[in-house]
A protein has these predicted regions:
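Active-site loop/turn elements of alpha/beta-hydrolase fold enzymes
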Residues: 12
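Active-site-adjacent betaalpha module
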Residues: 2-6, 15, 21-137
């Protein structure tokens, strides 16, 4: 933020019926239920002027659309960090790369974590193979 960069959070957001959804049936762990402490952006991360976009699944089509339309006139560079490398981060990175193939996309591996160390490494390798720059690996 102090460099003048825009900060946008995506927040996994589910309802009380999560376990009855297609995702919930395949990943039967209630998490990020709207309004709970686990749903909120962690203390110390939210900064003034940051945007928070709720997303019902792994990748954010809404954010991709915003970046493609509202930011289309800007020289766009995207840096991703977050949890989980092997679910949400990789999904957003690939979604953004497909939507904006010329935009430089970077993932800071030191600011990410996967479900397991192995799945974290696999996700980083997948992103590298798709021409997404991975730093601090």
């Amino acid at each position: 933020k102090k460099n003048g960069d825009e900060i946008i959070f995506t927040r996994d957001t589910h309802g009380e019926d999560y376990l009855d959804t297609p995702e919930g049936r395949k990943l039967p762990v209630k998490h990020c239920i709207r309004g709970t402490d686990g749903w909120q952006i962690a203390d110390g991360l939210m900064v003034s002027g940051a945007v928070c976009i709720d997303k019902p699944t792994f990748g954010s089509n809404r954010l991709a659309g915003i970046l493609m339309t509202e930011r289309a006139q800007e020289a766009l560079e995207i840096e991703l960090v977050g949890l989980c490398t092997d679910i949400c981060v990789v999904s957003n990175a690939l979604l953004f790369k497909a939507a904006m193939p010329e935009a430089p996309i970077t993932v800071d591996a030191s600011c990410c974590a996967g479900v397991t160390p192995e799945s974290h490494r696999h996700a980083l390798e997948t992103m590298k193979m798709c021409q997404i720059k991975v730093v601090n690996d």
